[in-house]
Amino acid sequence: MDMLNGGLAGKLILFSIPLAFSSILQQLFNSADVAVVGRFAGDQALAAVGSCVALVGIFVNLIVGLAVGPNAALANLIGQKNRGKINSMVHTILTFGAVLGIALFVIGMLVARLVLVASGTPETVLDQALLYIRIYFVGIPFMVAYNFGSAIVRSYGDTRRPMYYLIVSGVLNVILNLLLVIGFHLGVAGVAIATVISNVVSTFLIISHLYRRNDEFSFRFDRMRIDTNELKKVLAIGIPAGIQGAIFSVSNVFIQSGINMFGESAIAGSSLALNFEYFTYDIAGAFAQAAVTFTSQNFGAGNMKRCKKIFWLCLLFGFGFTEILSVIFIVWEDFFVSIYTTSAAVAAYGIIRMDRVCALEGLTATYEVASSCLRGTGKSLEPSVITILGTVVFRLIWLTTIFRMFTTYDMLMNVYVASWLFTGCSMFVVYFFHMRKMDKLFAAR
């Protein structure tokens, strides 16, 4: 895909649709985990999996955030037409990914019990939650490899291939869920095992694709090494984005502690409602991914006017399409919630969360697109700091002040939209100041 010339709107949509579909598809498969557990293993098992959501989110968001680095760094080299360094960058990315994956696996195993206990996971579900999360962490190295491999593929405009690989691994995940949970009665362990196997398959497919290539994007095991200069470029963007993602999830651990105060029904209801938030957020996230890739290439080519147009189009599409799906979920929320549970108490908590959070998920596009455009120009620290202030510090202040004064489930849920508004407005200010500075810099050349 030529990101440097021609119309933008159509290309942004064509680039983003497979990304959004891939993420939604992945979430559908994750939702199948929740639905199978809730329907065939019981509310206690569902609460056990739900108790792990925040901890899983820390690692997943860290990995996804770090993967922004490879995507932006490679796209920038493509924009500069610097083909000589691309293959070195590819091998640096995947070698670093292998080391990182093993390190995260070890860390996850060590902190699992500590985090679950600290977040107030009920004793009745703690053992099941610990079993689930420890099996889940076995798949972390493969998750890193897949995300880094996909970042390489997306950098040159191919978003369809990762989607096809997710379809294959996701269908396998659902089949294994049904087999292991219903057929072999393995409960939460069965769901975790199915997830690990699907991660292995998706990783095999993406690495095999890169191995079959014979151009600058090809991968060979005997060339695995780290070029420190290339790694610095990746980490300069990836580390702030990764830390942002991880710390963002830390705030959700504190929110999860608040949810745990309301009992197993609240935990299970919040867990099922979270699936719909992921579906809607995936659309905003897809256009944010498009923003960082398109901006990186055009910034590398020195086209600031096109970079600004990318921002406005991604913001419009990200907010608009996200809200369309949100409205669909809210209008038919009773039906959607009934897919996951037959418990009236669990459903009631799920619907409250959907009405308070999912209904305005489009607001996430404001800070996601702006931060992605900033990273596309090499500015990664500032958006990370703003996101941490808006989604961690702001939420902690809310939890320790407003929520303490009005200790209700509804008030706890209100923290999400309030923090999105604060973060989005702050990110806009930084974006416009930065772009004005870039205009002056390029005009002086």
Language-model features: locations:
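Short alpha-helical transmembrane segments in multi-pass integral membrane proteins
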Residues: M1-S16, L74-P141, G183-I239, T295-L360, ...
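Residue-level signal for short hydrophobic patches within transmembrane helices
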Residues: N5, A9-L28, A32, L55-L62, ...
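Transmembrane helical elements of multi-pass membrane transporters/channels
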Residues: L14-D33, I135, Y146, S169, ...
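Helix-terminus/linker motif at the lipid-water interface of multi-pass membrane proteins
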Residues: L28-A47, L116-E123, L179-L186, A246-A273, ...
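Small-residue hotspots at the loop-to-helix junctions and early N-terminal turns
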Residues: A41-A54, A129, I133, A192, ...
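Small-residue-rich hydrophobic transmembrane alpha-helices
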Residues: L46-V106, M143-P162, G269-E333, T364-T387
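Hydrophobic transmembrane alpha-helices of multi-pass small-molecule transporters
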Residues: I58-N61, N173-N177, T203-I207, F279-D282, ...
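Short runs within selected transmembrane alpha-helices of multi-pass transporters and secretion channels
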Residues: A67, Y136-R154, P162-N173, V191-I206, ...
